[in-house]
Every structure is written in C-alpha cells, then in structure tokens.
Regions:
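A Zn2+-metalloprotease active-site environment signal
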Residues: 2-231, 235-244
Length: 245
C-alpha cells in the first residue's frame, strides 16, 4: 500500500496544474526578487491561509496528542496549551529572497514565518502552502521551552518501529512537523470541498518531496523517505491516495 500511495503522490504531481515544484528543482533555480509576481502571489496566498492554518494546526495537535496517548502524561496538556498559544500569536508572513527554497522561524520573532521567495513561487496550491505553514507553526509552538518534545519523541518511536529506521532527535521533530502538515492539509481539504479529485488535493501536501536527487542530512530524512514515513504513519491517507476515497 505504501508503495502505491507514494507513487500516486508523484504521479499526481505530473498532471496537476497546481503541482508543487520538487525541492531539488527549487534549489537549482536562480534567486527570485520579493517583487516578482510569483513571489507576491505566493506571499499573499500564505498570508490569506495563515488564520485557517493556525486553527487546523490546533485541531491536528490535539488529535495527535490523543492518538499517541499523551494527554494523561503529567504536564503535557499544559505544554500543548502553551504551544497552541504561541501558534495563535503568529501574524506575519515575511518573504525573503535570501531564504530561497526554505521557510523558517526565529524564536526571537515568534510572530513571523519567513518564506523564501523560491519556495513561495514553488507552492502554487493552497494545500501545499497550508502544509508548510503547519510545519513552521509546530516549530513555533515548540518554542524554546520544548513544549512538544514528548510528541516528537512519540512520533519518532512509532516511525522507527514501523519503518525500521532510527528516527530520533531533530529528524523526529522535523518528521512530526511534516506529519502535522499533512494532517492539517487533509483537514483543509475537508473544509474546502471542490470538484478536484481527492488524491490530487491530498498529494499537494507531499509533492514537493518528489525529487530526483533524494538526499537527507543530519536534521532531515531524505524527501522520498519522508513521504514513505508519513504515509506509514497515516494509513488512512495512503488508502485515500490509492483508492480516491
């Protein structure tokens, strides 16, 4: 099932007029001024979607906390509440040419998400943008107090068991942020019905990982392994990608 679902993500990208650009393709592109039409449109899209993304991230975090049976752990609910308060406080999307194909947050300015202009231009769909917004909002929610460290640990343990990989530390945090991204994008799809096929809309939250050069680093799993790990953690999403319902 995982092989079929992973193939469906990248197959949909090939025919989708709103397909995300793969990460390795973005990395090879020249820098894009913040005044370029693609960057301006991307920044406006991200700013428009930010309020809804914040609300859906809150839902996703609460669901994951329940799914991973963390609610009964001492102090965890208070930490999640602090994380959600930090998420709710985010107000600004700031495009940045030097950030290129990345999005990032800085603890000294937790109300702002910085988006590279190449990244903004490479995510032409609402679903793709929502997934990345959610990823960055989780980092903000975790903050300097490690509010979500127990969730990162739990996701890393489950992902390690299901994939036979060793996923801990920063890669577990990044994978959890991606997991919240896919869950949040799926909630967005449910909240905004359209005539587009379900697999196409779902795939947009993952399609930027459909790379030719599949390389990870000390902090991240490789893009294609990320797709497989996320689909392994979310079998419902895998079935929807394969069967369209």
């Amino acid at each position: 099932m995982i092989d079929l679902a992973s193939a469906a993500v990248c197959r949909e990208r090939l025919s989708d007029p709103k397909a995300s650009v793969p990460i390795d393709d973005m990395q090879a592109r020249p820098s894009l001024p913040i005044t370029s039409p693609e960057a301006v449109a991307g920044a406006e899209r991200a700013q428009r979607l930010l309020p809804m993304a914040k609300n859906l991230v809150e839902v996703s975090l609460r669901r994951l906390s329940a799914d991973y049976k963390l609610n009964n752990r001492s102090g965890f609910n208070a930490r999640v509440q602090r994380a959600i308060a930090r998420v709710r406080a985010v107000k600004v999307i700031r495009p940045d040419m030097d950030s290129r194909d990345n999005a990032s947050v800085f603890l000294k300015n937790p109300q702002t998400i910085v988006f590279g202009t190449i990244f903004l231009a490479g995510l032409p769909s609402d679903e793709g943008v929502v997934s990345v917004l959610a990823h960055e909002l989780v980092h903000i929610g975790d903050g300097g107090e490690d509010n979500l460290s127990q969730l990162f640990l739990a996701v890393g343990i489950r992902a390690s068991r299901l994939t036979s990989l060793k996923i801990h530390g920063q890669p577990a945090e990044e994978l959890t942020c991606d997991l919240v991204g896919t869950l949040t994008a799926r909630l967005y799809v449910s909240a905004t019905p359209s005539y587009e096929p379900l697999p196409r809309r779902i795939s947009r939250s993952l399609a930027h990982n459909c790379v030719e050069q599949d390389e990870g680093d000390d902090d991240h799993l490789s893009p294609k392994i990320t797709i497989r790990a996320l689909l392994t953690l979310n079998p419902t999403l895998s079935r929807e990608l394969v069967y369209g319902r």
